[in-house]
A protein has these predicted regions:
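RecA-like P-loop NTPase motor core of helicase/translocase proteins
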Residues: 1-186
């Protein structure tokens, strides 16, 4: 199954978001130093989809993620996504929805699939914000490496070294994205 045909306002939002992200990507590529790359990301590399319940924000986010990861345009990024849901009970639901709706996105398992070999643009790790940012035993496990998996921090560093951008979709941000300080640290 592929994504349903978007409604006019959804299509317009997706096109506008892609324009913003592609502009940020062009600025990032032209930047000559880390400070310029950080500025390009901070000023142009994020957006907020705010719309009423039932308007298809999750569908639009998936369409943006899928299209921006596609290798069919030079202005797209080679990107790995982290898709945050507000509650653990929604993780499996989000994974199933992404798998069934977006053929250009590949869901990966954050617990056991933290390796860079075989990574491709459009890979998506679905989890909760608390699972990577909170200070608890489960988070420490994800943030620690093992014999067969990298720590989350090392995974992100290696992906960046391999030329991947790191993208984040925060679904229902008002529910679980509590502390900006932890978000910046991540």
């Amino acid at each position: 199954m592929s994504a349903p045909a978007p409604k006019g306002y959804q299509r317009e939002a997706v096109v506008n978001a892609l324009e913003i992200f592609r502009y940020a990507e062009s600025q990032f590529r032209q930047a000559g130093d880390d400070a310029s790359r950080a500025a390009a990301t901070a000023f142009n590399g994020c957006l907020l989809l705010e719309a009423p319940t039932g308007s298809g924000k999750t569908l639009m986010a998936g369409m943006i993620a899928e299209t921006f990861a596609a290798p069919d345009r030079d202005s797209n990024a080679q990107i790995v996504w982290f898709w945050f849901t507000p509650f653990a009970t929604l993780v499996e639901q989000a994974k199933a929805s992404i798998k069934s709706t977006f053929v250009g996105l590949r869901v990966r398992d954050l617990q056991g699939d933290r390796k860079t070999r075989g990574t491709k643009s459009g890979d998506v790790y679905v989890t909760t914000w608390a699972s990577v940012a909170a200070s608890n035993a489960a988070t420490r496990k994800v943030r620690s490496g093992g014999e067969y998996v990298l720590s989350l921090d090392d995974l992100i560093a290696e992906l960046r070294a391999d030329g991947f951008r790191i993208g984040a979709v925060v679904d229902e941000a008002h529910h679980g994205f509590a502390t900006a300080k932890e978000a910046v640290r991540f």
